[in-house]
Amino acid sequence: MMTYIVFILSTIFVISFVGFSSKPSPIYGGVGLIVSGGVGCGIVMSFGGSFLGLMVFLIYLGGMLVVFGYTTAMATEQYPEVWVSNKVVMGAFISGLIVEVVFVLCVLNSEELKGLFELNGMGDWVIYSVEDSGVFSKEVMGVAALYSYGVWLVIVTGWSLLIGVIVVLEVTRGG
């Protein structure tokens, strides 16, 4: 049952990102990001990261709802364009979905999928030891992996947030 839930959440996650990338109107782009953020937090929570999922939900969606509310108020159209009103936008949406399906099929058919990093053993993770037994903490492991193996991800995320703030400031100033 858990596999089906994660599969459905992942499908909604991909469709919302394809919908965001082929947005015909800023309102639908914001809705796509909000849906993908909420579903992404649900995926994280389904894998046992309840604290991380809740924090991302509160911080990401709380902050982004303010930004989307402000930018939507600035860019409101009386009759917003939808996906089916323009053949080019609908074609981009469908082609994005086809590319995602082909990618998933290629990944499922490949015998070996190599990751971006390798783990050298249990010594790379934080272990709580009590006498003869040790316990992993999932959230401590995630934070340790993020700042050791995923340092490039932190840098790209920080840079993307900075560029996003600059773009929002330029758009609202009319530059």
Swiss-Prot record:
Localization per record: Mitochondrion membrane
InterPro entries: ComplexI_Subunit6, NADH_UbQ/plastoQ_OxRdtase_su6, Nuo/plastoQ_OxRdtase_6_NuoJ
GO CC entries: mitochondrial membrane
Reactions that this protein is recorded to catalyse: a ubiquinone + NADH + 5 H(+)(in) = a ubiquinol + NAD(+) + 4 H(+)(out)
GO molecular function, one term: NADH dehydrogenase (ubiquinone) activity
A Pfam family the protein falls into: Oxidored_q3
Entry keyword annotation includes Transport: yes
Top-level EC class: translocase
Role this protein plays: Core subunit of the mitochondrial membrane respiratory chain NADH dehydrogenase (Complex I) that is believed to belong to the minimal assembly required for catalysis. Complex I functions in the transfer of electrons from NADH to the respiratory chain. The immediate electron acceptor for the enzyme is believed to be ubiquinone.
Protein name listed in UniProt: NADH-ubiquinone oxidoreductase chain 6
Lineage: Eukaryota, Metazoa, Chordata, Craniata, Vertebrata
Gene name per UniProt: MT-ND6
